[in-house]
Amino acid sequence: MRFDEAYSGKVFIASRPEWEEADAILYGMPMDWTVSYRPGSRFGPSRIREVSIGLEEYSPYLDRDLADLNFFDAGDIPLPFGNPQRSLDMIEEYVDSILEKGKFPMGMGGEHLVSWPVIKAMYKKYPDLAIIHFDAHTDLRVDYEGEPLSHSTPIRKAAELIGPHNVYSFGIRSGMKEEFEWAKENGMHISKFEVLEPLKEVLPKLAGRPVYVTIDIDVLDPAHAPGTGTVDAGGITSKELLASVHEIARSEVNVKGADLVEVAPVYDHSEQTANTASKIIREMLLGFVK
């Protein structure tokens, strides 16, 4: 890596030049092969990196600086275009390798289906895993028009793997009636519309447990994040989402990995969504990687 590459927009700002000593690995999952509405999230990771050079390295929320954190931006996993299953397998294998080295995986999507293989890898390492999920949508379908590999199915797959009672979804305001009924019947926690106050109630219950945090950027209202594939009105503000990340960071839960997905730059004409996403990623790195 060139000396100035950490500030070039080619990697996330302040990335270290070598991975061996890094505590966290930032990586992209540029896949949007199964989106049901507007594609383009495969370009999300690269745009988030590009705009990250506009960030300050210091977080006044957490009183911590990226200079204090040893993380490495590994770039994007070279996923085979149009091949969902092979792409998911490659993601799982890569995250397995990160976890084997004792490093924190911080992923960038890509559509939300990319979280599924990451969760599988996390669950192998941490069988007591719980998931904190921020999203506009339930993502609890069994399939989408007969296809089980869809960005509308990852949380259903995760819930069936680790147990619905170990999945906590926040900000949900869209989904099929059957999805909400399945969650209720199976003991899954869904907080409709709201995020911060319900999260505060849940976090003490997860104290000491390994947790994976997945954020779909469309949990934000389209006024705050227009650059995503499936916008849904009535969402939360970026201030509320940042406060939620900080609430997790200051809690007693043991965050072991995280991702942020569904940034689609083609619909993000002012780069508002990518800029918001890059700040959230900075806060997750500084807040979750101890």
UniProtKB/Swiss-Prot annotation:
CDD domains (UniProt xref): Agmatinase-like_2
Keyword Hydrolase attached: yes
Pathway stated in the Swiss-Prot or TrEMBL entry: Amine and polyamine biosynthesis; putrescine biosynthesis via agmatine pathway; putrescine from agmatine: step 1/1
Domain of life of the organism encoding this protein: Bacteria
Binding site for Mn(2+): H112, D135, H137, D139, D216, D218
Protein name from the UniProt record: Agmatinase
Catalytically driven reaction(s): agmatine + H2O = urea + putrescine
Enzyme Commission number(s): 3.5.3.11
Cited function: Catalyzes the formation of putrescine from agmatine.
Recorded name of the encoding gene: speB
Enzyme class: hydrolase
GO molecular function, one term: metal ion binding
Cofactor requirement: Mn(2+)
InterPro entries named among the record's database cross-references: Agmatinase-rel, Ureohydrolase, Ureohydrolase_dom_sf, Ureohydrolase_Mn_BS
Pfam families cross-referenced by the UniProt entry: Arginase (PF00491)
Entry keyword tRNA processing: no
GO biological process terms, semicolon-separated: putrescine biosynthetic process from arginine, via agmatine; spermidine biosynthetic process
PROSITE patterns in the record: ARGINASE_1, ARGINASE_2
Keywords noted in UniProt: Hydrolase, Manganese, Metal-binding, Polyamine biosynthesis, Putrescine biosynthesis, Spermidine biosynthesis
